Amino acid sequence: MEISPGSSTHERDRKGSYGHRERTRSHSGSPSRFYSKDKRGSSRQGVRPRDRDSKDSISPQYKQRNWSRGGGGGGRDRGRNDFSYRKKGKDYNKRRDKRSRSRSRHRSPKRSGSSKKSKRRNSSGSSSSDLMDTSLMSELKKHGDYGSSSKSKKKSRKRRKHSSSSSSSSGEAMDLPVSSNGMNVTAIPPPPSFNINPFQPMFSQPPPPPLPPNSQFMTPPPRPPPAPFSIPPPSVDIHFAATASFSLSSIPPPPPQTDGGASSSKRQDPLPMPPDSKRIATRPVITTRRGHATNRPSDSDSWYKTNLTHYTMLDQIGEGTYGQVYKAVNNLTGEQVALKRVRLENEKEGFPITAIREIKILRQLHHKNIVRLMDIVIDDISMDELKRTRANFYLVFEYVDHDLIGLLESKELVDFNKDQICSLFKQLLEGLAYIHNTGFLHRDIKCSNILVNNKGELKIADLGLARLWEKESRLYTNRVITLWYRPPELLLGDERYGPAIDVWSTGCMLGELFTRKPLFNGNNEFGQLELISKVCGSPNVDNWPELTELVGWNTFRMKRTYQRRIREEFEHIMPREAVDLLDKMLTLNPEKRISAKEALNHPWIRSLEHTTVQPLKLPQHQDCHEMWSKKQKKSARLGRQAEGSSGSGHSIRATSHPRAPTQPSTTTTKSNGSSNHHHHHHHSHHHASSLPPSGGHAPPPPPPPTQASSTSHNNHQPVPQSQYQSVFFK
């Protein structure tokens, strides 16, 4: 046996006893014979092979084979009683730690249940060549076509003898890049003196081509860029990769490794990220609600390009809780507009919510019978003034000459016939049906919010209280709609309402167009309910089953029960078809109330022929609106007070209603008899205090009239008209 002259004394002693260990090992043909011999010993009785395996891994070497620490032992263990195993102290501990580290580093995942033969091979030496050699051989036995013949075993023993003599030349390990199934790993290469030619008969497949020189391993070719959406490579064990490098011939060259050694080979490349999808950023398209897309006005692009200095205010035409409304002229175009000033004095949270709602809703509603919002402007002030004071916001609307309340109160200027009233009311229903169809509630229908221009075109305005309606799925406030136009369900505290509330208000306006007076002008909610009950009947469970669910029903107590008498009250002043539509719009139960769309299909509306309707004769020199009407009433009242006559004082009391017609005192005195004659028969008790009591009349039913009263009665031929005026005009 050749021993390298450069080896140490310890190496020579160990290698000298190597032959004896090989001869002793050849007596056992398989690992099973070791187990059978071990079972004869008393120290291995009743221990299973797996348990013994795990127990041997944590016990000292001299206890695994019944070695004696003093150096004595059987013939099989005589070769292990070498100086390297008898020596105590630091050298022995270092060798034991080195053996445990080498076993853990080179142990394959399937070595946990290996035989004793492989364990003795691991403990036979501590040099790097033996450790690497045994690791490669064990893998070749597992994965190659290695038989159990004695010839193969003898060759393996000769190979171990030959490799032990070259321990000095195998001190350094080189990185061997190996590729298997697309996975690039790094394995420890065999020593330079390792010759694989004697092992070629052990493989069933043809021999692989010779390995490339060492320089190629040190400078591998650059890694190609990974293809997008590539399949992640499978996980490959490092020991199997080292074996596969000798058996697979069609392996591509490996990419360079950043870190050498076995520890870096277990690191897999991160999963390739897919390329970023090129999404086209599209702007959201804002359309009207519920699929009713309409074209925006052509001047919407000119918003926010002007301020208040571009307008000249002419006169104030309205005022309310929201602010003031002014008539103005655009200095650039000469067009008349209406500037609605948004009041900010009492706002603690900035811009009022009612103005925000009106702006949002009006920008979604585009109809010929709805007023058009044109722009929003602010005061032309500097930044320093803006810090000290609040800027005024103005909503710019198209200017409409009149409102309906101003036209109704100017009887000497405007007079409507039945066809003209039907034409105006049809336009009102068309605008209201459009609002409801787009999913909104107006919640403030009244005469002052209905505008009419000089061409006779009607437009709905003031959508500050409008809200989006969600099919009665949520609660809304019942403190909406002016009291005179408020439906009974809101008066009783209903908070789950729908478009029927606007239909009731529109029905009140239908009667007001013919009578020129509000139908129900109560002073409070209970008084308003009492007036409604006198004309529309008392609400009860029979005609309104959901009445008991309302909050105000338990606290509302009527003085008496009234019958419904709408047709009797209005048949003599309205067409029969119009009375039928009014009756359906003033239904107490909101579930049975007609809708705006259904009202457009009513026979009275459908019978209208626009070719036969005469155009409205509206005043061209005077704009009739609510504020102008109030000024006229105030001046007339001051003029009557200046006269100082006793009759004028009575006339003022008789016309104390804000929209009652002014009548001379003689006319009022003359009509006292007829009006008081029917006072208890009709339900106009809210005017009774304005009429002087008459002591010569009996309680109802009235007695037969005397000759004088009969003569006076004959002098007034239109008796039904006189009766109606006593109810609604006094």
From Swiss-Prot:
The record's region (Disordered) falls at: 1-230, 246-283, 623-730
This entry carries the following GO cellular component terms, namely: cyclin/CDK positive transcription elongation factor complex; euchromatin; nucleus
List where Basic residues composition bias occurs: 95-122, 151-163, 676-688
According to the UniProt entry, what is the EC number of this protein? 2.7.11.22, 2.7.11.23
Q: Write out the biased-composition intervals (Basic and acidic residues).
A: 9-21, 75-94
Q: Where is the composition biased (Low complexity)?
A: 194-203
Q: Where is the Protein kinase domain?
A: 313-605
Question: What are the UniProt keywords, alphabetically?
Answer: ATP-binding, Kinase, Nucleotide-binding, Nucleus, Serine/threonine-protein kinase, Transferase
Principal localization reads nucleus
Q: Where are the transmembrane segments?
A: none
Q: Where in the cell is it found?
A: Nucleus
Keyword check for RNA-binding, yes or no: no
Q: Give the reaction(s) catalysed.
A: [DNA-directed RNA polymerase] + ATP = phospho-[DNA-directed RNA polymerase] + ADP + H(+); L-seryl-[protein] + ATP = O-phospho-L-seryl-[protein] + ADP + H(+); L-threonyl-[protein] + ATP = O-phospho-L-threonyl-[protein] + ADP + H(+)
Q: What does this protein do?
A: Cyclin-dependent kinase which displays CTD kinase activity: hyperphosphorylates 'Ser-2' in the C-terminal heptapeptide repeat domain (CTD) of the largest RNA polymerase II subunit, thereby acting as a key regulator of transcription elongation. Required for normal reproduction.
Report any one BP term from Gene Ontology.
Answer: nematode larval development
The entry summarizes the disruption phenotype as follows: Phosphorylation of 'Ser-2' of the RNA polymerase II C-terminal domain is undetectable in primordial germ cells and reduced by 60% in embryonic somatic nuclei. RNAi treatment causes sterility.
| Polar residues compositional bias, start-end | 57-67, 714-730
Residue positions binding ATP: 317-325, 340, 398-403, 625
Q: Which domain of life is it from?
A: Eukaryota
For this UniProt entry, the molecular function terms from Gene Ontology, in alphabetical order, are: ATP binding; cyclin binding; cyclin-dependent protein serine/threonine kinase activity; protein serine kinase activity; RNA polymerase II CTD heptapeptide repeat kinase activity
List the protein's name. Answer: Cyclin-dependent kinase 12
Question: Which catalytic residues are annotated?
Answer: D444 (proton acceptor)
Which InterPro entries does the protein's record reference?
Answer: CDK, Kinase-like_dom_sf, Prot_kinase_dom, Protein_kinase_ATP_BS, Ser/Thr_kinase_AS
Q: Which family does it belong to?
A: Belongs to the protein kinase superfamily. CMGC Ser/Thr protein kinase family. CDC2/CDKX subfamily.
Q: Where is the composition biased (Pro residues)?
A: 204-230
> What broad taxonomic lineage does this protein's source fall under?
Eukaryota, Metazoa, Ecdysozoa, Nematoda, Chromadorea
